[in-house]
Amino acid sequence: MANNYKDLFIDIDSFDETNIIYVKPLLFFEASRHMGIYYEKEIIMKKPVVNPSNKSNKSKKLNKTNKSNKSNKSDELKKSNKSNKSSALKKSNKSSNKSSNKSSNKSSNKSSNKSSNKSSNKFPDKSDKSDSSNDSDNSDDSDDSSNDSSEFETIKTKKKQKIIIKTPKMIVPFGVKEFDNNGRKNYQMSLSFSTMTNLYNEEEIKKFHGFIKLTDKINEETIMDYKDTWKLPKGLKYKRSLQRLSKDYPHHININMPHDEKMGFMFNVYDEKGGKSKPDIIDKRSIVSAIIELTDLKFTDTEFRANWTLLQVRKFKPYSPIQEFFMTECFICDEDNPEDTVYSKLIEKYQQTLKTPITFPQYPQMNPSHSSSGYAIPYITPYQSNYPIPYPPTYPTTYPTTPLFSEPTIPKPPQQPTTEPPSGFKPPSLSELLSAKKLLKPTKTTVKGVTEGKVVESDDHTSVADIPPPPPPPPSISSDNSSPNKSVKSSTKSSTKSSTKSSTKSSTKSSTKSPSKTPVKSPIKSSSKLSDKKSPTKKIESSGESDSESDSESDSKTTKKSTNKIKKITNNKLENSNTKNNKKFSKKKTISLDK
């Protein structure tokens, strides 16, 4: 029964109203007011059929095979007898030539040969029989199988059963309703024929609506035709199964939910996953699919109606399988964003469900504009970059083409590394160097341990800086300790002579260079008291001469390259040299006065 449970359902498309049977019980409408309804369903079965012509053909074939076997056996016996006789004659000739002592052996051989010949004649080979019989059997079996496979007989039988139908997914508009019938509880559930369910089953609901409408019509017509014969009340009316609250609402059908006070509900309720549950899960506006049965017709004094009973019910989700599919994952890909991973996640999830990995098409299939010699650059989709191709294509090996007359290629000379200066460094220009020279401050040479003296005004209105003399030199080491004064006198004389000579020389030089220029007063301060000791003028004069000579040499070089600015600098230096000469003349005057 479990394997053929679909045979219990009645197909709405092939429903025949003439097969409906009404069964009137005993003492109808007096004792029992229920009338049974059944349906004669046709069941088609196929059986293999064996025709009588096939039987006669089989008998003829068997007779032919037996005759052929007999003829083959007789031919074999004749051949065996001839061969035995010829062998016996040859042996007898040979035995006559031999001695009489072997006569007994010959007789025994003859007797044995005869016995073997007889046995072979009486019992031919069994292997031949078995082979021939097997061949005939196989041929017969093949003929039978061919006949059986080609011909079947269709047998139609009628089965009397209840009208059982599986409803499509429908809405429960009011939920489960409970009634009290004289202390007994009755439960009822309604199914709406509304097509606003977003379940894509409008056609199935229309077919079911037409089937219920047809059964209502047949029930009403048959009962009204037999109302007088069955002695039913004259004012009896039929209450249709398709009910409607108003024109604003669709039709609905009421289904009884069998219930017993001891056993409870006598049907099963299943949840969305197919597990057993309680009727409490069937709420208002829930979507269910039920198996219902047209059990009987119930009569009262005023009306009669069809009794639809619930056999099984299952609750479903309030949306279609397509909508449920789109609720599992995100299927909206952002084609403008290359970093979008929605499509890659879908492919990964799909690959996990497959037993074998997805084989992507090769490049020639994706880009058919490839040439016969080689492959063109493949077109890569925006989502293909995230996934490597499991089977990379094998490109043909390309060989470099060489021209017929190729020119010799000269190797390039090795490039020496060039040491470039850093980008931030630039050598200074000549103008920058000259401007930097201007900024240098003039320095003053000083001697350690020598204090500056006062400025003494001479008769010629010239100021001279009186520099105090340095300490006396150490005494010379000599053998005579009694002549220290002589050494002092000689040193003073030599110093005076050298100072006079150097002063005259420097004065003559300065006078020749700048005869027209007047001497400039020096801003050097002198001390208040003049020292009586002699100053070493020779050393100071020599240092001044070396400075003037170095300055004159540098001036001569710069005048050739520099502009008018350099000439001004040379003039200033000449003025400084004049001031030094004036100082020397003033020093001579002071020395002469001391003397």
Swiss-Prot record:
Biased composition (Basic and acidic residues): 123-132, 454-463, 530-542
Biased composition (Acidic residues): 137-146, 544-553
Listed Low complexity bias regions: 83-122, 398-409, 421-430, 477-529, 571-580
Record field: compositional bias (Pro residues): 410-420, 467-476
Residue ranges with Basic residues bias: 559-570, 581-595
Region spans: Disordered: 50-159, 398-430, 450-595
Superkingdom of this protein's organism: Viruses
Protein's UniProt name: Uncharacterized protein L291
